[in-house]
Structures are given as structure tokens and as C-alpha cells.
Design a protein with these regions (language model features):
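Repeat-mediated protein-protein interaction surfaces in helical alpha-solenoids
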Residues: 2-6
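A short, mixed-charge helix-start or loop-turn motif at secondary-structure junctions
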Residues: 20, 56-60, 119-124
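Solvent-exposed, acidic/flexible segments
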Residues: 27, 31-34, 64-68, 123, ...
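Polysaccharide-binding and catalytic clefts of secreted carbohydrate-active enzymes
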Residues: 111-186
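Boundary/entry segment of secreted carbohydrate-active catalytic domains
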Residues: 7-33
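Active-site beta-loop-alpha junctions enriched in small/polar residues
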Residues: 25-27, 54, 90-94, 156-161
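Hydrophobic faces of well-ordered beta-strands that scaffold small-molecule active sites
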Residues: 18-22, 49-51, 85-89, 152-156
């Protein structure tokens, strides 16, 4: 079944419904509980969930290894139950292997020390290395799920500036200077 995403008319036969749900992190639980999760969602009237917000490490457990199997299964399970998927970019938290290989993706505090990895948005938004890896991830997600009828929205991110609102790295300084040049012409 193909659904056209038209906010706020979503998911109902008469076009009068709105999205009702929240974040769902199935990758943090045993697959054996997913059926109960979906049943309880249906019982609560949930018709949309945001999935994969913190899942980059599960989707790409190693630099050259991708695992979409679990995501395929949960999207299919949700969709067949009539619950639409708002698929996240999964960039809210980068995998630890990325920080280990490229510590320069971490933001820096005002003393030049890297901010610890492992929390939401522990990456520098101006890091070209982070952007390259994040873009690869987003392309893979779009290629795989771009035509999936159960994916009705793309969750690009929220709560910006959580752990990276202050970044004193050279990349941040250069990005700010470029912004000033473009805005003020000097």
C-alpha cells in the first residue's frame, strides 16, 4: 500500500487523522519483544513512530559493513500493522569506530580538548570528515528505503546543539569566518 505524506492528513482512510506516536528504539531491545511493542502501540492508538534515531552503530557496525536486516524487519512489522515509519538519518550518535578512526570529528572545548564521544551529537557539525560519513549513511538509507511504502517521513534530526553547541575547533572557526565573509562581504 502506498501512502502519500500530506501533513497533517495522514494515515487514515478519510484523510482526517494526524500522526500520533513517538520515538521507538527497537535496536535497543531484543527482537523477541517487538511483537508486543507493536501490539501495545496499536492498543494505544499509535499510527506513526520515529525509528533509527540513535542507530548508526547498529546500521554500520564497522566502517565497511552494513546491517539493514533488523531495520528491514521492524519497518515491515510496523507497516503491516498500520504504523507508519518516520525514518531517522541515524546521525544523532555516531559509531565509536568513527571516533576512534577520526578523533578530529569531535568538537573541542574552549581549551582545545576534545569533547568525549558517546553522547548524543558528540560530533562537530563543521567537521568535513563527519559530514562525509553522515552523507554516506543517509544515501544508503535513502537508496534502501526511499520507495518503501511504510516510510512516510524522514526524520532529519532534532534537538540540535545538544552536545555540540560550543565547538572551538579549527573547523568551526573556519566555518564561522566563511559565514562572516558571505554575510558581510569581507
Amino acid at each position: 500500500m502506498h501512502r502519500t505524506f500530506k501533513w497533517p492528513e495522514l494515515l487514515t482512510d478519510n484523510g482526517k487523522g494526524i500522526a500520533y506516536g513517538g520515538d521507538y528504539n527497537p535496536d535497543q531491545w531484543s527482537e523477541s519483544v517487538w511483537d508486543d511493542d507493536v501490539r501495545l502501540m496499536k492498543q494505544a492508538g499509535v499510527n506513526t513512530v520515529a525509528v533509527a534515531i540513535f542507530s548508526w552503530d547498529r546500521i554500520q557496525p564497522e566502517e565497511n559493513r552494513w546491517d539493514f536486516g533488523w531495520l528491514d524487519r521492524i519497518i515491515d512489522k510496523l507497516g503491516k500493522a498500520g504504523i507508519a515509519v518516520d525514518l531517522a538519518s541515524a546521525t544523532a550518535t555516531a559509531p565509536l569506530w568513527l571516533y576512534e578512526k577520526h578523533p578530529e570529528v569531535l568538537p573541542q572545548d574552549k581549551f582545545g580538548h576534545p569533547v568525549n564521544a558517546g553522547s548524543r551529537q558528540s560530533w562537530s557539525p563543521t567537521s568535513p570528515v563527519f559530514k562525509e560519513y553522515a552523507l554516506t549513511l543517509c544515501r544508503k538509507l535513502a537508496e534502501r528505503y526511499g520507495t518503501n511504502p511504510y516510510v512516510t517521513a524522514w526524520h532529519m534530526g532534532n534537538e540540535y546543539g545538544w552536545n555540540n553547541r560550543y565547538d572551538y575547533s579549527d573547523n568551526a572557526l573556519n566555518a564561522f569566518r566563511l559565514w562572516c565573509e558571505r554575510k558581510y562581504g569581507t
